[in-house]
Amino acid sequence: AEVVADDMHYCVRTYVANSDRIVCHPSYQAYSYSCFLRNYSQSLTDEDISLIPCAYLHNYQPEYRQTLSNPIYKEWTGLAPFFIKNEVGAFSDFVKKYITKKSSKGDLLYLIDHGRLRPTKALQDSLASMVKGNKEFMLLDEQAVCFDMCLKTMSQCLKDKKKRTIIIQGGPGTGKSVLAVNLLMEYINQSLNASYVTKNSAPREAFLRLLTKSDAKKLVNIKQLFRSPFNLSKCDINGYDCLIVDEAHRLVKKMYGDWNGENQVKECINASLLSIFLLDEDQAVTTKDIGSIDEIRHWCETLGSRLVIKDETKLISQFRCNGSDAYIQFVDEILQRHEESIAVDLSELNFDFRVFDNPNEMRDALRVKNLENHKTRMVAGYCYDWNVKHRRGDWDVMLEDNFKAKWNLENDKVWAINPDSFEEIGCIHTAQGLEFDYVGVFIGKDLTYNPVTRSIETHREAISNDDNSSGIRSAAPAKAHQLILNTYKTLLTRGQKGCYVYCEDHALRRYISLSIKVLSRNL
């Protein structure tokens, strides 16, 4: 194993499952499992059962012990000591210290394993204290209306025991995730078994850090409330009271390693009495993304879940891009996403949008914003190879004017909130669902402008051969075109205060520059 000095100090790098991977420290794993049981097991509370976590690594070699006992892990090793191959005696003494006699009924493990899973009062209070009073999670306008409707629907489900599914639609910056976290808090406060679900880990990690202010103990205490759809196929029917599925447009049929998985939309609906899907179909960015309204409707009919989709479940008000619907319309216009062009009034747009001719100048301008304490990140589409990951070179993104940068592949889970991540370029998977003060978008050769036909053109062949996730290179032309446009719309709408753009295609650069000079015009 090898120490990984991330900002939370709970990971190690090791060779497992035929690959070099970053995994959780065993003491952290043991402690996190004990937190889950304390927070959810009714039996532990009722029977006054104590939990003492530890880790036994029966095959871990003594010469590597110093790696796991590195001082940066002392918080976790203090809470859950670990024992290795030649420490059987010490491990035995530790167990004997805390287990002195047989439980009175002899069924202690059975009680824990078969006990009712419900959030404890301590977990309810912990989550509520993090959300309430946190300005990042205040509900506004139609968010509050939708929130109230979701609470009433949950009450109805509990009353008549009938499955229901709510679809909440909203474009970029309409507050879908804020609504989702508030719903999670309220359902947990009602002692309901609920979880916040996203396919991608980046939004989960970001909200965990935001809620806990990166306090390691607080984070591990609520981490089990934020989960992946992975392995939901093993869940009992209505095993959850509610699953709140954010970024639902990114759901897929199955993830690698989820051998029992069939369809994540189906599995979310099947596993919960009430399933809530928050989505934006225009943000589907790979050929595997299946979280559409039609897909959800199909599985509702199949599984007997009543579908709720109405005016109250549509979020329209814009809280990103300085609250400007005009900017979102402007992005749609320059990407020519609609057949009919519309007039976009940018005269009162209080949003810092710039197009740069030099990628180094754009990075320098963004770096200044970042140093001024504005949360700033650089992002790009699928065009650039993963040279560093595959040991083919020192740089991934190489542009004119000797611009060089790396992808964020090493620490993609925390890239959005790690203050040291500015110099790395984020991909769609780590940026989607998140927001920054300023975002810099590198538009590659997959998107160009034809001045003769005055049209935006996409080029699936420009997608990197290292891209094994989007499926764009082998997609049908129309599908590839849609996914490329969706990708750039998503990236261009990550900023709250500003968006800086560099285009590899000179004609596209000029087209966008001319577009923003006209305050109101059919582009």
Task: List each model region and its residues.
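Accessory nucleic-acid engagement/destabilization modules that flank
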Residues: 1-110
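N-terminal pre-P-loop "Q-motif" helix
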Residues: 135-164
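Hydrophobic anchor at the beta1->P-loop junction of P-loop NTPases
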Residues: 168
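Conserved lysine of the Walker
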Residues: 176
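Conserved helicase/translocase motor-coupling segment
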Residues: 180, 286-291, 305-329, 336-454
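Conserved RecA-like ASCE ATPase "motif II neighborhood" in helicase/translocase motors
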Residues: 213-271, 423-427, 487
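Signature of the SF2 helicase/ATPase Hel1-core->accessory helical subdomain module
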Residues: 244-310, 314
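C-terminal accessory regions
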Residues: 276, 424-522
